[in-house]
Amino acid sequence: MIIDNLTIGKYISRPNRFTIEFKDKDKAITLAHLHDPGRLKELLIPNTDVLLKYINTYKETGRKTKYDVIAIKNKNNWILLNSSYHNKLVEELINTKEINSLENFHIDKPEIKYKNSRIDFLLKDDKNNPLYLEVKGCTLVEDTTAKFPDAPTKRGKKHVEELMEIHEKGIFTMVLILVLHNDADEFKPNYDTDIDFSQTLHEAYISGVKIYPLKINTELKNNSIILKKDRILSIKFKERNK
């Protein structure tokens, strides 16, 4: 996936969960919409380079901000911070058969309703067998270990529990975690931040729900971000009851 026509600014502050202040090339302070509601404390550091996309239709749509935050620099990496691209990226990877375990599947419906929730994708294989797929985005990496979530997520826990329910009916289910950091070599649930989600993810894994942390490499080239599939990372769960 390519996200083009980007501009670089300097991150200043985060007035609220969905807005940042940045300094543009003319040193003017401007607001931008931040689509990722996570804590991001290890990334949102003053004077850090941030990539932004100008939204031509911001007046017509009644937006208060002219820009969307796309990515932020961390060491020598660009980290995708715009979660609205997660499902678009997964859709592209499925359609181009780049995820080996899903190469026999196609997208039947996005945003499929289940009880009072919506699961990101309903896939079907060549024999019409369904697979319910939930997508999560992971930006937190400590040393070379990717960790999710970076903030407590009751909604995420609920999604995983629902996938376990579906799996118990004999239907394929999967959590696809997009690891959006070039330095990641393995994945571990973030027990310190959300023990309930982490234990639920482990239970789902044991029950047969497929948990795939898919590393995505990011490159900045000609004012564009290029996102490419790398590989499925190994998962490091804690021993149960510890």
From Swiss-Prot:
This is Sugar fermentation stimulation protein homolog. GO terms for molecular function: DNA binding. It comes from the Archaea. Belongs to the SfsA family. HAMAP family: SfsA.
